[in-house]
Amino acid sequence: MHQGSRTCQISSEGAVLDACYTLAGDKVATCSSTGAIQVWSCETSEASWDLLHVEELPDQPTLLAWCHPEHGQVLAVGTSSGTVHILQGPPPSSSSTSSSSENGNSSSQQQHSREGWGLTGKLPRGQGAVIALAFAPRQQGLVLAVGYSSSPAAAARLGSSLGSSSSVLLFEAAGVVRQQLQWTLLGKIQLPVEADSCSSLCWREAAAGLPPLLAVGHSRGGGIWAYQQPSMRWKELCSLPIPAAAQQQQQQQQQQQLQAMHWAPALSRPRELLAASFGSTVALYSLTPAAPQNNTVSNNTLQQPGQQQLAGLQVELVTVMEHPAPVWKLEFNMIGNTLACSLDGMPEVWFWMPVGMQRLEGLAEWSVVSKIKGNPEAKAQAADDHMLD
């Protein structure tokens, strides 16, 4: 793990709207209010970032998402117009890398990494602005889930082709034609009528015997959906109850939609854990498979050999974690016993861990074990200098 902090200069006239790191953390992509997409690289031991590529888009980019590196350097860019652009980099060059290492000079490798970047595809426009992007686990192929906001004007323009209310569309890269990724509509998740927009998406890691599972957050809560192979449709398995504290925030601040979610790694636990943030409240849910209608006994784990369908999920609100500011992003560590929550408007990250006898299952009370606090003055400086930490 890298120590210290790394700072790269963002040479953009507008504000940085989103930043997304690759799985290895050696590249970061940013999008600005001017419509520019920048890809930065830090592949050496030195804490210096190099600008690999700049792409100007005709519409306003708002969200970024990298796919798993097994599928290459593929970056999805969501826009306020509902279009998703696909930016792709060159494949890794083992020959240039080895020759650079032998000669002790990485100039050819850096030159190769800067070449070959460009737009290689575009997904059909949705009914509203792109609100959420999430690539599926690598075992499920190059599949991208896109969440949209509901837009009456856009829905009238598109008719019933992509739905008339808020929805999540799933696309798959079926192949390459003339150096362009060809994307096909794989499926659609229709959100409740009262949901104004999709707010967040989170895939469960792939596992043998389990159908694809996708957690969807929206303006009226959230739910978990599973792909049913016989009907080739997505089915909602359960809805996520909104904590009482979050409901009070909704009444006081008019609305606190589900902002972020993250699925804890299973690691043979008897139950699943899913964290979701509603404003400053983070809810931790326990998930177990519901018993089939013809059987009153259900297995207490999702991962059952040979199982391809789930009748439903039983949801239990385990605990809530309160913060002094809204939580805009959260993530479990690789073993699922630590939850990091990043605060919005405050340069702080809170780390929570379970305590008590049931801490191995995650059902105990969770408490703050550490905090990372940034420099409050850096926020004002970043706004002036367009810096990204």
Please name every model-derived segment.
Residues 31, 78, 147, 216-217, ...:
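Residue-level marker for isolated small/hydroxyl-bearing positions within beta-strands
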Residues 2-12, 46-63, 92-95, 102-132, ...:
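Inter-blade linker and blade-boundary elements of WD-repeat/beta-propeller domains
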Residues 20-25, 65-72, 134-141, 202-211, ...:
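Loop/turn segments within WD40 beta-propeller blades
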Residues 28-55:
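Beta-propeller domains
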